[in-house]
Amino acid sequence: MKSLLPTTGLALLLALSLTPAQGEEVTLEHQGLTLNANLETTGANWPQGPVVLMTHGTLAHGGMETLQGLQSALKDRGISSLSMTLSLGLDNRHGMYECATPHSHQHTDAVAEIGAWLGWLQGQGTAKVALLGYSRGGNQSARFAVEHPEVPVNAVILIAPQTWNEADAEQDYRQRYGKELAPHSQL
C-alpha cells in the first residue's frame, strides 16, 4: 500500500497540471441580456495585447473543451484570450444550449455580440485583437469582419468554419435522397 501512495500522488499532481487554464468570468450587458465570457490573461499588462476573441460553434459555449485548450495554448505562448458564450437569446447562459429549449435566436445575432465584446476589449485598453471562430463561430466571426470593416481587427482565424448555402443544401438533399427538401406536414 505504501508504494502506491507516491505513485497516486504523482499521478494526481500530473493530472492537475494538465487541466485547462481557468480564467476569470467577465460579464457585460447587451440588449437586455447579460453576456459572459472567460478571460484568460498573461499578466497585469494583458490589454497591451495581443488578445484573441473566441467564438464557439452551434449551441456550444465559451467554456467548451476545445476553446479551453486553445486558451491554455495561447496563454503558454504569451497571448491573452477572451472566450465568449453567445447568449442565443438567453440571459447569462452557461453550458450547452438545451435542444429541447425553443430556438428564437438568429444566426446573425452573434455579429452584434461579437461587436459588444470587441467594444468591451477596447474599453479595457486593448488595441491588438484577433477574432477566432470555431465551426459556426468561424462563420460568424468572418461575417463580423466583412460587415464591420471600420472595427480594427488585426487578424481573423477560422477553424473548421461552418459554411452553408440554401440552394446547395437543397441540391445535396435531392441528390442523396432522390426527392425535394420540403416541410413534412404529417407526423
Residue positions per predicted region:
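Bacterial N-terminal signal peptides
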Residues: 8-17
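N-terminal cap/lid segment of alpha/beta-hydrolase-fold proteins
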Residues: 21-44
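The alpha/beta-hydrolase serine catalytic core
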Residues: 35, 102-105, 152-187
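Short, surface-exposed "cap/lid" segments of acyl-processing enzymes
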Residues: 46-47, 52-77, 81-86
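Cap/lid segment of the alpha/beta-hydrolase catalytic domain
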Residues: 87-105
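Alpha/beta-hydrolase active-site loop
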Residues: 101-123
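Short beta-strand immediately N-terminal to the catalytic nucleophile in serine-hydrolase-like folds
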Residues: 131-133, 159
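Gly/Ala-rich beta-loop-alpha elbow adjacent to hydrolase catalytic centers
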Residues: 133-137, 141
